[in-house]
Amino acid sequence: MQKKTNKNLRNIAIIAHVDHGKTTLVDKLLQQSGTFKKHEEFSERIMDSNDLEKERGITILAKNTAIQWKKYRINIIDTPGHADFGGEVERILSMVDSVLLVVDALEGPMPQTRFVTQKAFSYGIKPIVVINKIDRKHARPNWVIDQIFDLFVNLNATDEQLDFPTIYTSALLGTSGVSYNHMNPDMIPLYNAIVKYTPPPTVYPNCPFQMQISQLDYDNYLGIIGIGRINKGSVTSNQSISIINNTEVKRTGKIGKILQYLGLNKIEINEAQSGDIIAITGIDKLNISDTICDPQYISALPMLKIDEPTVEMLFSVNKSPFSGTEGKYITSRQIFNRLKKEENYNVALKIKETNDTNTFSVSGRGELHLSILIENMRREGFELEVSRPQVILKTINELIQEPMETVVLDIENKYQGTIMKTIGQRKGTISNITPDQNNERTRLDCIISSRSLIGFRTEFSTLTSGSGLFYSTFSHYQKIESNKIKRHRNGVLIANKTGQAIGFSLFNLQNRGKLFITHGTKVYEGQIVGIHNRVNDLTVNCLSGKKLTNMRASGSDEAITLTTPIKMTLEYAISFINDDELVEITPKSIRLRKRYLKENERKILLRNIKE
């Protein structure tokens, strides 16, 4: 088997923690390489194509691009930085020969940095460390380098991996340098580092064709697009191939078009060589991990390893009285087809049918992972109901065990006591407390169960007035210490009739608690309209107006002033509900409701539970 290297090709991924600037870095690499032509419009965060990505400032789906710099073609994959989307990260690492590990010059390595770096080390990849945001006030690059070295040691890095090259950048300003004291006004030092320290791919030009599907895309005209790196040989358009999963021959097919990345475009080519990352069309029902190979030399590549889901939710057809009034897709078949389509692309997601034909079990890597899916479906016109997230338990060595997570909280000092108390209530363990160099903020390192984290993100944001930073990643499984985690949530106010809420009635209810609705809001019997001041649920009438009389008032009526209702976001709703409640999601509304809408049904259920 003749082995060579393609000296003018580099395959590299960019991995980093959320909001450490990797997407902006890719923008600048594309811009300064000359890959964009003069007539092409440039916008910031060009690699984030998903609306949710731009709104939240995070990367959810891995993106592929390539730049031509001098004689070198550099394939770049911008990967997610959040562990909930780690399924994307793992597949990407199977396609590249090096990674740019982007770390904030002030914050240093964070939990997701640890997560993706550990994955990279497991593939034997040597990283190029990029200390980004070097222009930040109070940047501390030397401290960050020490933190990265300690992290690598803890992850059992080899001597070669510990001898990592470092480049300093400000992606925002488009500058880089091998020393933070001597910065170039461009990205040339970073281009040079990529070419110098990324090994050119090993190629087998004379072997039969073989590649593995690491990503899937879809085009309305081209259909399913399979993306992967050619492991051996070469491929031409219209070539006959076999599609296999592990060692089982599945079927034969024919490749349609071969597409190569350049900038933000896919360019059609007639032939692609070993080592390159390409996209192919013409093959239906492709799956992640499928091996595409020469029919005469069938050989499957090892299946890609993906961490298992840790959280599950039930997705159901919307059965509320307002069902079908706001959405376009409302049937169980439409919801199931959409979920199965998502499962094809979203490899960390698992869909199962249940005994109820209108309900499906959806499991993923965390609350954020599933809430992104729900939000996307909502924007596409779907109506559905979802349950409270439940942690997936495992039986290991005849013991029931639950997933544990490493959590890092970055908070202002004044909130430290409150947050530490909350962590204790959720059975978490604080392993380290680190004040920052200005003694204004504190970093808390904790180990806490995934079960305890459900709803904590929203509570944490409220307790820190939005100023706290929250990071988490899966750590390990361990025996359940306590079956019950105390939830300090009051009871709820439940509407007893269907109609439009009246301001006069809501005004009188304000003394009972905080409301989710305002005057004129349509409500139905069994809908949750507010939070009760006490721990019990209370059924209320929010439709009654002021009694009319035939007597003229001696003075003017008092003006009714309603307090601003609590803003209902998807994350808040999912974390707020109890097991006997559901979140109703439509393109226009997010409502909370009881599973049983009739008050007498709820009373019977409560009585049976007590007995």
Curated annotation (Swiss-Prot):
Function of the protein: A 50S ribosomal subunit assembly protein with GTPase activity, required for 50S subunit assembly at low temperatures, may also play a role in translation. Binds GTP and analogs. Binds the 70S ribosome between the 30S and 50S subunits, in a similar position as ribosome-bound EF-G; it contacts a number of ribosomal proteins, both rRNAs and the A-site tRNA.
Where does it primarily localize?
cytoplasm
UniProt protein name: Large ribosomal subunit assembly factor BipA
* Catalyses which reaction(s): GTP + H2O = GDP + phosphate + H(+)
Indicate where this protein resides in the cell.
Cytoplasm
- Name the keywords, alphabetized: Cytoplasm, GTP-binding, Hydrolase, Nucleotide-binding, Ribosome biogenesis, RNA-binding, rRNA-binding, tRNA-binding
Task: Give the HAMAP family listed for this entry.
Answer: BipA
Amino acids binding GTP: D19, H20, G21, K22, T23, T24, N132, K133, I134, D135
Entries under Pfam families matching the protein:
BipA_C, EFG_C, GTP_EFTU, GTP_EFTU_D2
Q: What is its EC number?
A: 3.6.5.-
Entry's family note: Belongs to the TRAFAC class translation factor GTPase superfamily. Classic translation factor GTPase family. BipA subfamily.
Taxonomic superkingdom: Bacteria
**Organism listed in the record:** Buchnera aphidicola subsp. Baizongia pistaciae (strain Bp)
Q: Which PANTHER family match?
A: TR-TYPE G DOMAIN-CONTAINING PROTEIN, TRANSLATION ELONGATION FACTOR-RELATED
| A molecular-function term among this protein's GO annotations | guanosine tetraphosphate binding
- How is the subunit organization of this protein annotated in UniProt? Monomer.
Signal peptide positions (record): none
| InterPro entries (UniProt xref) | BipA (IPR006298), BipA_C (IPR048876), BipA_GTP-bd_dom (IPR047041), BipA_II (IPR047042), BipA_III (IPR047043), BipA_V (IPR035651), EFG_III/V (IPR035647), EFG_V-like (IPR000640)
The record's disulfide annotation reads none
Could you mention a single GO BP entry for this protein? ribosomal large subunit assembly
Which residues are in the tr-type G domain?
7-202
CC annotations in GO: cytosol; ribonucleoprotein complex
